[in-house]
A protein has these predicted regions:
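Transmembrane alpha-helices of multi-pass inner-membrane enzymes
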Residues: 377-386, 392-424
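Hydrophobic, aromatic-rich transmembrane alpha-helices
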Residues: 24-27, 69-86, 198-207, 351-370
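Flexible juxtamembrane loops connecting transmembrane helices in multi-pass membrane enzymes
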Residues: 179-186, 252-263, 271-305, 327-332
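N-terminal signal-anchor transmembrane segment
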Residues: 2-81, 383-387
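Hydrophobic transmembrane alpha-helices and their immediate junctions
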Residues: 84-89, 96, 264-265, 348-387, ...
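Long extracytoplasmic/lumenal interhelical loops at the membrane interface
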Residues: 47-54, 171, 287-349
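Aromatic-anchored transmembrane helix interface
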Residues: 94-106, 113-137
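Alpha-helical transmembrane segments of multi-pass inner-membrane proteins
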Residues: 147-171, 188-248
Length: 424
């Protein structure tokens, strides 16, 4: 009997070690896949393959990080049991339905001959949905560690942006020619750097880092947003800072003491913010604000609505290929890019499919936000408000995936476990 007990114990210990090794492997592969998608810009990828240029096979038009995420997904979802409780089941179902809807959308685009359009939705939204499913397959500790890694990535990007703004030398390749130098950090565009830094402030405050580390991270991200030249993103970041201060609970203080403490901190933030603006302006890092917020570049986002005079009703109902849309924007409207996510999604998908897609995206985001901390909610709202001012939602970017991964990383999982599952 003793020998059998020892054998059983050895087998159980060996099985436990095997499960731990598999969990660690999936965790590391997940981080590697996410970082591939989140840090390799289109300009870098173009050095190795024809990712954004004309011609080439469709397989070349998908990001290497997207392939990595799609390869990790079966391993994370099938290789071991997934333990979901309470409201987590509803979140998993919501993400799965969103992914299936996108697969159906890809089939639709292929049937109507708009295969070039599908690359945008695969790289931006399908990869984000699959990344969300991978996150749901992780343990609570693994999710939070992944979130910490992504926040550190945003901090590195912000610090790179500050270095680039000071030295006027970009670390990564950037092919666009601009009248004024703007840093990009680890992103593909200065506006993307500003958007992610702005949203990252709230996500940094949602971590479990020491208070001083969270405040330092928020400060670095705010400076990164400021030097990026993304004016609207900086305005949303400023509003976000006040929202985080006023709307997030301070559980270790009574309500009365919390109000008093917030009033003192608010005064300090106003003084510190004024000093920061003066310092950055004196260093010439806020030159983009010299012409105000609504200059010629900002008016491009208004003049893009003239596109309705250059397309037919068939385009409005059934959409148009991505290359045809670019041709209209550049040759008819004489604009370099289409920096309007609503117009881009409408013209790429057509009105019925665009309404279906936007509704599904909004519903999915609201569903995964359930039981998220106030700082996480504020961060996601900041992200979408800032992203709507540029093309982060309508081109092949990792921004949506980054936001979704961070929301799932910093959700209140204990509350989700105890809550009953709801339909949807």
């Amino acid at each position: 009997m003793t020998d059998f007990a020892v054998d059983d114990g050895g087998r159980l210990a060996g099985a436990a070690r095997g499960r731990n090794a598999l969990a660690l492997a999936i965790f590391l592969l997940t981080i590697a896949a996410f970082l591939l998608r989140f840090t390799i810009s289109p300009e870098v990828l173009d050095r190795f393959e024809n990712y954004t240029g004309d011609g080439g096979s469709f397989l070349q038009k998908l990001h290497v990080g997207t392939y990595a995420i799609l390869l990790v997904a079966p391993l994370a979802l099938i290789s071991r049991p997934i333990v979901l409780r309470g409201d987590e089941i509803g979140k998993f179902k919501a993400l799965l339905r969103f992914v299936l809807l996108l697969v159906g959308l890809m089939v639709y685009l292929g049937l109507v001959g708009h295969i070039s359009t599908s690359g945008i939705f695969i790289d931006t939204y399908l990869a984000a949905g699959v990344a969300g499913l991978i996150m749901m397959a992780q343990s609570e500790a693994a999710r939070r560690r992944i979130g910490d890694v992504i926040v550190v990535m945003l901090l590195v990007s912000a610090l790179m942006g500050v270095f680039e703004a000071v030295t006027h030398h970009r670390i990564l390749p950037y092919d666009n020619v601009e009248a004024q130098f703007r840093p990009i950090g680890l992103t593909e565009h200065p506006l993307a750097l500003g958007t992610l830094c702005a949203a990252g402030i709230g996500f940094a405050m949602a971590t479990r880092w020491p208070v001083w580390a969270r405040l330092l991270a928020a400060f670095v991200l705010l400076v990164g947003c400021a030097v990026s030249g993304a004016r609207f993103a900086l305005l949303t970041a400023a509003v976000e800072v006040f929202a985080l201060l006023l709307l997030t609970p301070w559980p270790k203080l009574t309500r009365r003491h919390a109000r008093q403490a917030k009033a003192v901190v608010l005064i300090l933030v106003l003084i510190g913010g004024a000093a920061l603006v003066a310092l950055l302006a004196s260093a010439g890092l806020l030159s983009r604000f010299g012409d105000g917020v609504f200059d010629a570049n900002a008016m491009v986002r208004v003049s893009v609505y003239d596109i309705f005079g250059h397309v037919g009703w068939q385009d409005l109902l059934f959409g148009m290929p991505a290359d045809a849309l670019v041709e209209v924007v550049q040759k008819q409207l004489h604009l370099p890019t289409l920096e309007s996510a609503p117009i881009a999604i409408l013209m790429l998908l057509g009105l019925p499919m665009a309404l279906l897609f936007v509704g599904a995206l909004g519903w999915t985001m609201l569903r995964v936000l359930r039981f998220a901390r106030a700082s996480t909610r504020i961060a996601l709202l900041t992200f979408f408000v800032a992203a709507l001012s540029n093309n982060a939602l309508s081109t092949k970017t990792p921004a949506v995936a980054i936001a979704l991964v961070l929301v799932l990383a910093f959700s209140n999982r204990e509350a989700a476990k105890s809550a009953p599952d709801r339909r949807g």
